[in-house]
Amino acid sequence: MQVMTTPGRLGPSLATTLQAFHDGRPPGADEDVHMVPAIVDHVIERLSSPGDFVFDPFAGFGTTLQRAVRLGRRAAGIELLPERVEYMRRRIPEAWVTTADARDLGPVLRLFAGTVDLIVSSPPYMTMTHHDADPLTGYEKSGGDYDRYLDELGTVAEQCAQLLAPDGVLVWNVADILHEGVTTPLVDDVATALKAHLSLDAVVPIDWDQLPHDLTADVLLVFRRSLHTKK
């Protein structure tokens, strides 16, 4: 991880624990793919106000949406896997949720372009090697390619920029990964992909008592809508 900038309103770093991560698994979820709820709360409380509109393009099991609703924000999200969409609709009826591919936000843009105050998400991760499953298909298709994955995350970010209000903020949780002896610098690579479409505002490290899985560094990438964002 090389990229550094000022931490802004989130503080210089955030602390959490592996136990908090495990405890934060949504009820009924079959895997740990969520952000730590306390970190999501911190982001939402610091970067939005009650009544603001929060969006998640990789909604998963709905941690961001559930926390946003609990904190008095309006919430919307999309998820590729229909069973997870049904799960969120049952669990968070106050949120707007639909089945969609984050690489094609056209229908969402037609509804919400320029109105989202805060985007909070964690994209599905990929390593540079030993990773045939394609993350942006819900890991359900093979033929994954790391460079294509980064390009497609850039496509997601470009559309997210169009969803943001003029003073809107995007926060993505991204981590470097050590797998099969190879470290994937996902933080730097994702930051580079997003900087083509948004203005980098801060990189906020998350300090764990014990990093989960095979992560070697974990951060929040904070971006603002660029002046050149398409309307």
How should these model regions be labeled?
Residues M1-K231:
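Class I S-adenosyl-L-methionine-dependent methyltransferase catalytic core
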